Design a protein with these regions (language model features):
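Non-heme Fe(II)/2-oxoglutarate
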Residues: 2-99
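Catalytic core of non-heme Fe(II) oxygenases with the double-stranded beta-helix
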Residues: 79, 83-185
Protein backbone atom coordinates (compact mmCIF):
# COMPACT_ATOMS: atom_id res chain seq x y z
CA UNK A 1 0.00 0.00 0.00
CA UNK A 2 1.48 3.35 -0.97
CA UNK A 3 1.35 5.89 1.88
CA UNK A 4 1.91 9.57 1.12
CA UNK A 5 2.27 12.16 3.89
CA UNK A 6 1.03 15.41 2.37
CA UNK A 7 2.70 17.47 5.13
CA UNK A 8 6.12 16.42 3.83
CA UNK A 9 6.94 17.66 0.36
CA UNK A 10 9.05 15.77 -2.17
CA UNK A 11 9.13 12.52 -0.24
CA UNK A 12 9.52 9.13 -1.88
CA UNK A 13 6.58 6.77 -1.69
CA UNK A 14 6.59 4.61 1.43
CA UNK A 15 5.17 1.13 1.45
CA UNK A 16 3.87 -0.53 4.57
CA UNK A 17 6.41 -3.11 5.70
CA UNK A 18 5.40 -6.70 5.11
CA UNK A 19 3.15 -5.99 2.12
CA UNK A 20 5.86 -5.90 -0.54
CA UNK A 21 4.78 -9.23 -2.02
CA UNK A 22 1.18 -8.25 -2.58
CA UNK A 23 1.08 -6.32 -5.85
CA UNK A 24 -2.67 -5.68 -5.66
CA UNK A 25 -2.44 -3.54 -2.55
CA UNK A 26 0.91 -2.10 -3.57
CA UNK A 27 -0.25 -1.01 -6.96
CA UNK A 28 -3.82 0.18 -6.49
CA UNK A 29 -4.61 1.17 -2.89
CA UNK A 30 -3.32 4.61 -1.86
CA UNK A 31 -3.36 6.46 1.45
CA UNK A 32 -2.88 10.20 1.84
CA UNK A 33 -1.98 11.40 5.33
CA UNK A 34 -3.29 14.78 6.47
CA UNK A 35 -5.73 15.22 3.57
CA UNK A 36 -7.85 16.92 6.26
CA UNK A 37 -6.48 18.54 9.41
CA UNK A 38 -7.71 17.64 12.91
CA UNK A 39 -9.84 20.80 13.21
CA UNK A 40 -11.64 20.07 9.93
CA UNK A 41 -12.31 16.52 11.13
CA UNK A 42 -13.78 17.78 14.43
CA UNK A 43 -15.98 20.26 12.54
CA UNK A 44 -17.34 17.53 10.25
CA UNK A 45 -18.09 15.26 13.23
CA UNK A 46 -19.81 18.10 15.12
CA UNK A 47 -21.98 18.95 12.11
CA UNK A 48 -22.94 15.30 11.65
CA UNK A 49 -23.75 14.92 15.36
CA UNK A 50 -25.95 18.01 15.14
CA UNK A 51 -27.82 16.51 12.19
CA UNK A 52 -29.87 13.37 11.77
CA UNK A 53 -28.36 9.88 11.98
CA UNK A 54 -29.87 6.85 10.28
CA UNK A 55 -29.12 3.31 11.42
CA UNK A 56 -27.69 0.90 8.85
CA UNK A 57 -28.38 -2.81 9.21
CA UNK A 58 -27.56 -5.90 7.17
CA UNK A 59 -29.55 -9.11 7.66
CA UNK A 60 -31.10 -7.61 10.82
CA UNK A 61 -27.65 -6.90 12.29
CA UNK A 62 -26.68 -3.35 13.20
CA UNK A 63 -23.60 -2.12 11.33
CA UNK A 64 -23.30 1.64 11.85
CA UNK A 65 -25.07 5.00 11.60
CA UNK A 66 -24.86 7.39 8.64
CA UNK A 67 -25.46 11.10 8.14
CA UNK A 68 -25.38 12.97 4.84
CA UNK A 69 -23.40 16.22 4.55
CA UNK A 70 -25.75 19.04 3.54
CA UNK A 71 -23.74 22.12 4.57
CA UNK A 72 -22.27 24.05 1.63
CA UNK A 73 -19.21 25.01 3.69
CA UNK A 74 -18.46 21.38 4.59
CA UNK A 75 -19.22 20.28 1.05
CA UNK A 76 -16.59 22.73 -0.17
CA UNK A 77 -13.98 21.37 2.28
CA UNK A 78 -14.75 17.77 1.35
CA UNK A 79 -14.85 18.52 -2.37
CA UNK A 80 -11.33 19.93 -2.04
CA UNK A 81 -10.06 16.98 0.02
CA UNK A 82 -11.60 14.21 -2.08
CA UNK A 83 -10.83 16.04 -5.32
CA UNK A 84 -7.22 16.41 -4.18
CA UNK A 85 -7.02 12.69 -3.44
CA UNK A 86 -8.48 11.83 -6.84
CA UNK A 87 -6.01 14.17 -8.58
CA UNK A 88 -3.06 12.57 -6.79
CA UNK A 89 -4.44 9.11 -7.54
CA UNK A 90 -4.91 9.99 -11.22
CA UNK A 91 -1.25 11.03 -11.41
CA UNK A 92 -0.43 7.35 -10.75
CA UNK A 93 -3.40 5.86 -12.64
CA UNK A 94 -4.42 7.94 -15.64
CA UNK A 95 -7.78 6.16 -15.99
CA UNK A 96 -8.89 7.68 -12.70
CA UNK A 97 -8.80 11.08 -14.43
CA UNK A 98 -11.97 10.07 -16.30
CA UNK A 99 -13.90 9.91 -13.02
CA UNK A 100 -15.69 13.26 -12.94
CA UNK A 101 -18.67 12.68 -10.63
CA UNK A 102 -18.83 11.92 -6.93
CA UNK A 103 -21.85 10.57 -5.08
CA UNK A 104 -21.93 13.19 -2.33
CA UNK A 105 -20.42 12.82 1.13
CA UNK A 106 -21.67 10.52 3.87
CA UNK A 107 -20.38 10.51 7.44
CA UNK A 108 -20.34 7.01 8.89
CA UNK A 109 -20.28 6.46 12.68
CA UNK A 110 -19.25 3.14 14.18
CA UNK A 111 -20.16 2.73 17.88
CA UNK A 112 -18.67 0.09 20.20
CA UNK A 113 -19.16 -3.39 18.67
CA UNK A 114 -20.28 -1.90 15.31
CA UNK A 115 -18.46 -3.15 12.23
CA UNK A 116 -18.91 -3.71 8.52
CA UNK A 117 -18.29 -7.32 7.45
CA UNK A 118 -15.89 -8.13 4.67
CA UNK A 119 -17.47 -7.37 1.30
CA UNK A 120 -16.75 -5.79 -2.06
CA UNK A 121 -18.47 -3.18 -4.16
CA UNK A 122 -20.28 -4.23 -7.34
CA UNK A 123 -18.40 -4.15 -10.64
CA UNK A 124 -18.66 -0.76 -12.30
CA UNK A 125 -18.93 1.22 -9.08
CA UNK A 126 -15.80 3.24 -9.86
CA UNK A 127 -13.42 4.45 -7.17
CA UNK A 128 -14.13 4.42 -3.43
CA UNK A 129 -12.59 7.05 -1.17
CA UNK A 130 -12.73 7.34 2.63
CA UNK A 131 -11.20 9.75 5.15
CA UNK A 132 -10.78 8.77 8.81
CA UNK A 133 -12.09 11.53 11.10
CA UNK A 134 -11.45 10.16 14.60
CA UNK A 135 -9.24 8.13 16.92
CA UNK A 136 -10.65 5.16 18.81
CA UNK A 137 -9.88 1.54 19.62
CA UNK A 138 -10.80 -0.71 16.71
CA UNK A 139 -12.81 0.29 13.67
CA UNK A 140 -9.86 0.15 11.27
CA UNK A 141 -10.31 -0.29 7.53
CA UNK A 142 -8.82 -3.63 6.45
CA UNK A 143 -8.32 -5.22 3.02
CA UNK A 144 -8.26 -8.93 2.16
CA UNK A 145 -8.90 -9.91 5.79
CA UNK A 146 -5.33 -9.00 6.80
CA UNK A 147 -4.03 -5.60 5.72
CA UNK A 148 -5.04 -2.66 7.92
CA UNK A 149 -4.63 0.87 6.64
CA UNK A 150 -3.19 3.81 8.57
CA UNK A 151 -5.96 4.95 10.90
CA UNK A 152 -4.58 8.35 11.92
CA UNK A 153 -6.98 11.29 11.89
CA UNK A 154 -7.24 13.03 8.52
CA UNK A 155 -5.82 10.13 6.49
CA UNK A 156 -7.65 9.34 3.27
CA UNK A 157 -7.73 5.98 1.50
CA UNK A 158 -8.65 5.56 -2.15
CA UNK A 159 -8.97 2.40 -4.22
CA UNK A 160 -10.74 1.11 -7.33
CA UNK A 161 -13.88 -0.51 -5.93
CA UNK A 162 -14.62 -1.79 -9.42
CA UNK A 163 -11.74 -4.25 -8.89
CA UNK A 164 -13.89 -5.84 -6.19
CA UNK A 165 -11.23 -5.64 -3.45
CA UNK A 166 -12.68 -7.32 -0.34
CA UNK A 167 -12.61 -4.87 2.56
CA UNK A 168 -14.15 -4.47 5.99
CA UNK A 169 -14.37 -2.16 8.97
CA UNK A 170 -13.20 -4.06 12.05
CA UNK A 171 -15.31 -3.96 15.24
CA UNK A 172 -14.95 -0.85 17.40
CA UNK A 173 -13.90 -1.84 20.92
CA UNK A 174 -13.95 1.57 22.61
CA UNK A 175 -15.07 5.04 21.53
CA UNK A 176 -16.51 5.99 18.15
CA UNK A 177 -14.92 5.73 14.71
CA UNK A 178 -16.04 8.29 12.14
CA UNK A 179 -15.33 8.11 8.42
CA UNK A 180 -16.52 10.31 5.60
CA UNK A 181 -16.85 8.58 2.25
CA UNK A 182 -17.79 9.01 -1.38
CA UNK A 183 -17.60 7.11 -4.65
CA UNK A 184 -16.25 8.52 -7.89
CA UNK A 185 -17.81 7.48 -11.17
Amino acid sequence: MKVIDLAKSQQPAEYIEGTEWDRVTQDYIRQYKKILDAEQCRTIIAAANYGRWEEVTHNDTRMCDVSVITSRALDKILFGAFGGMLKLYASDFWRAASMNTDTGYTVVRYSPSDHCPIHHEPVGSGIRAMINLSECDGGELQFFGKEKVDSSVGTGTIFPSSFMFPYEILPVTEGYRYYVSTNFK
